[in-house]
Every structure is written in structure tokens, then in C-alpha cells.
Amino acid sequence: MAKILGIIGGGQLGLMLTEAAKKMPEHISEVIVLDPTQNCPASKAGAKEITADFKDEIAISELAEKCDIITYEIESGNSEVLKKLESKCTINPSPDTLKIIQDKLEQKKFLTKNNIQVAEFAEVNKLDE
């Protein structure tokens, strides 16, 4: 049975995801995007829209109610809200992953801990450091 795909972000990447999904009707029956811009690029490829801020808890919950799968094309999503909604639909990448990539210091620490090379970095907590 084909699934409904929700995408947080309807910009250029959302447009490309929508176009790709439309080529797989046996897997994806519909695409719904959440984006603050009405008539965002993804809507021009046939995605339905929920017009709201990327962090809007009510809008993200509405997206989860309407979709079987949620992904995102922008790091600005609300990882805490998505975490609460994991039982309602599949969310990939996971809200935990989103939380890590939203904080570049935490992202570098995570990558280093997992033996993935990153450029040298230093943690700075005050302006005089």
C-alpha cells in the first residue's frame, strides 16, 4: 500500500523530493509539505501544503496525523515535537539525529566520538575565549 510522505521544508530540496516521490506512485501516494511560504517550490511539483513555521508544534502534529512518513529538508525543525510524534508515524532521519545536527558543536563531538574525521575545532563558551 502506498504511503503519504510528509516533508518539513518545501524549498528546492522539498521540490526535488516531491518530484522523486511522484515517480514512485506504488510507494508514495501523496506528498504534503510544511513550509512558512505559501506556494512554496514543492507545491509547484504537486505537494499539498501546510503553511506554518518549521517549529510550529500544532502544524507539525497536523503533518504527523496526515502522513505515514515524515522527513525534512531543513535543519530548522522542532526535534522535541518530532520526538513526541515518533509513535504516530515513521520519522527519518530520527529526531535524535536532527537534534545533533542542529548544534554544530554537538555534531562535531558526535562525529569525533564515532571516529569520523572533522576539521579541528574548539569549544568556545565566552567571547574572550
Where are these regions (language model features)?
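Active-site nucleotide/adenylate-binding loops and adjacent lid/helix of ATP-dependent enzymes
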Residues: 100-129
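ATP-binding N-terminal substructure of ATP-dependent carboxylate-amine bond-forming enzymes
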Residues: 1-102, 106
